[in-house]
């Protein structure tokens, strides 16, 4: 068949009735979105001659996806979360908005209300014998001036690629901290070097990726929310240079301007200044925040998050 079938009056009436287009009340924009979605699905079924067995397999897949709580993971893996970033970049460019540090995907593993420290904190609880990391940088505005009272919200995986809260083997808020900058705009944390990770091998996201001939791996990376009064909230993450998946991230999060170069520190004076036991890796990354045009721009986007 061709999409002429979907355009038949009986099918079009079914789609309009299903979306409530001719029913008073409800949300008109939402109705229009659902109508477009249903029409596109029906056209796809007709164009690709999707069988009943394939249709119900897809319905069951949605059950499995929700049961494993992997919907957000799949959204990242199919590039939809990255698409939102690219679209917002285009909107900002069309409006001639000033740019700072690039945005990139949040991912599904943020947990709200991490402990807040002034200027510096230790992120790890000492249970993971990973390589020590000293992460630091400066928050600046677009004129290069330090931003005081910025909140740098940081989270990353352990050496096994797992995140606290979602991994019952880790302590609460392990590898999660918020740092408030001082007048110098600087932040620093002691932590451990994170590992990249792969999608759960038995999960629905990896099952779909297998059908596409794709892997489900991410490079080692560190997540950030950076916010400050009067400035546009930034959601971003940095990927660590040298990882084999740096430019082959299944979640499409790697972007120019968001790659950090880990540096091995062996200088005993620096080690002593940082109160570390020995050699460690230093990661330096500065952030540039843009001015907010409204109070809403100072806040992170609304979505379901753990403990929020």
Can you annotate each of these PLM segments?
Residues 2-308:
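Beta-strand-dominated extracellular/periplasmic modules and repeats
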């Amino acid at each position: 068949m061709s999409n002429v079938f979907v355009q038949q009056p009986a099918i079009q009436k079914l789609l309009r009735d299903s979306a409530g287009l001719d029913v008073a009340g409800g949300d008109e924009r939402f109705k229009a979105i659902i109508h477009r979605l249903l029409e596109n699905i029906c056209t796809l079924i007709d164009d690709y001659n999707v069988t009943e067995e394939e249709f119900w397999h897809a319905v069951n897949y949605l059950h499995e996806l929700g049961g494993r709580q992997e919907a957000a993971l799949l959204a990242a893996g199919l590039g939809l979360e990255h698409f939102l970033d690219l679209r917002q970049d285009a909107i900002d460019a069309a409006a001639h908005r000033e740019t700072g540090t690039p945005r990139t995907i949040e991912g599904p593993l943020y947990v709200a209300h991490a402990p807040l420290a002034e200027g510096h904190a230790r992120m790890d609880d000492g249970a993971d014998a990973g390589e020590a990391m000293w992460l630091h940088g400066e928050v600046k505005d677009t004129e290069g001036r330090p931003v005081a009272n910025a909140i740098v919200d940081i989270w990353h995986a352990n050496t096994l690629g797992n995140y606290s809260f979602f991994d019952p083997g880790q302590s609460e808020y392990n590898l999660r901290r918020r740092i408030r900058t001082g007048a110098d705009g600087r932040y620093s944390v002691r932590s451990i070097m994170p590992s990249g990770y792969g999608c759960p091998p038995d999960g629905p996201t990896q099952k779909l990726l297998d059908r596409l001939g794709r892997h489900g791996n991410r490079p080692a990376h560190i997540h950030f929310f950076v916010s400050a009064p009067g400035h546009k909230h930034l959601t971003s993450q940095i990927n660590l240079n040298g990882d084999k998946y740096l430019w082959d991230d299944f979640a499409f999060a790697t972007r120019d301007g968001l790659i950090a170069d880990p540096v091995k520190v062996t200088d005993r004076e620096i080690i002593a200044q940082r109160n570390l036991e020995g050699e460690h890796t230093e990661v330096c990354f500065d952030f540039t925040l843009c001015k907010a045009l409204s109070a809403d721009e100072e806040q992170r986007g609304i979505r379901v998050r753990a403990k929020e």
